[in-house]
Amino acid sequence: MRGSRLPAGGGNVFMVVRQTRSEALARGMTLLDLSIGEPRGPALRSAREAASAAILSEDEAMHAYQYNDSPAVPDFSRRFVSAHLPRALPDGEVDYLPISGIKPILGLLPLACGCAREAVTVATMTKPGYPIPADWCAYHPHVTHYALPLNAGNAFRFAPADIAPATGLIMTNYPHNPSGQVATVDWFRALCAHCAAHDIRLFNDAAYVCLSHDEESACLSQVAPEFPELSWAEAFTAAKLIGNGTGWHVGAMVGSKDFIADMKEVKGKTDAGFVAPMAAGAIAALEGDQVGIAQFRALYKERLALLTGLMQDCGMRLAIEPRAAFYTLWQTPTRAFGRAIDSARDFNVTMIEQTGVVGVHFGDFLRYAVCADVKAMAPALEAAFRKAEVGYG
């Protein structure tokens, strides 16, 4: 019999927002879209030119499968990771792996920790947070998942004391989507010490580290090598690094040899590697166009300041000051449009329907991104939030 074999209600928050947005457009509304975190416009010209040259190359390797290596772009993964770090990683202590972006490997991490054969407890930063790690955990029948506590009270940084006994894998995401919080060297050091002492594998999704606006922002890779017993890995991507590289699907992992070896085994059975010409373009920009990358970072920082000031003037309350990326996170008003607000979803859907402002509701919070030109949208945004007449308490 034909029909879905999946349980009902499996769509995540992004699917809900896209559906509501589509319905509003169908009604003829003009939208002020601050929802999905995808940069506008093209990738950096330096990346596009290098990718174009690679596509036109006669080198057979540039047009072939790359698998878990990158023969067309020699030493890509080490070079890509190293360009994100303040100092080189110790030779012989780590291994590298090219990836087609971070999202495709999130579901492989529990498998690399043995969840196909035995029970594994996985902790994630998904409440609030990017939902895909939790979504993948739900697909793995031997995984027990829990979300680490993240809120304004702990500044969206969990503590080692929050980690449940028998946890086998922790999947962190710093800088954090959606709060914009960063991890510091000292914070990572305390977490690494705990994981090493309790035999917990540790992974960090560092997708937004290239857009850090705070000098304290650190990568796991800066600290983890201090702990020889720690099994760890970290992933980086070109998606937001080179302007709009979201469709390029290029990145790299680094980590302890044991964890990367397990990831190579699992990943090697699920894909044939990234698209080499796009990798050639990404590494050319990363190594040769830091000015262009810095310009995008400065643009987002300027837009963050503009949007937070505008929304605060309209009565909205920040959950935390963003220190990286291009997101702002807000406390949900208890009143708007002359009535009580039941939830973040209620407020977001009502804002879309009443004003055309599109955000993303994450649990008790609301996320508004600055990928769009918020300066051009500012008058309309201010009018929309003033129309809402938000209140708290």
Give the label of every model feature segment.
Residues I283, A298-T308, L318-R335, F362-F365:
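Conserved glycine-rich beta-strand-loop-beta hairpin in the small C-terminal domain of fold type I
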Residues R2-G3, P7-G101, G288, G391-G393:
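N-terminal small-domain helix-loop-helix segment of the aminotransferase-like
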Residues A24-R27, H140, A197-H198, C314, ...:
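Helix C-cap/helix->beta junction micro-motif
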Residues L89-P90, P228, A340-I341, V349-G393:
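PLP-dependent enzyme catalytic core of the Aspartate aminotransferase-like
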Residues V17, L34, A51, F80, ...:
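Generic structural signal for small/hydrophobic residues in well-ordered secondary structure
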Residues A51, P225-K301, A305-M311:
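Conserved core segment of the aminotransferase class I/II
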Residues L31, T144-H145, L202, L318, ...:
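Hydrophobic beta-strand scaffold residues
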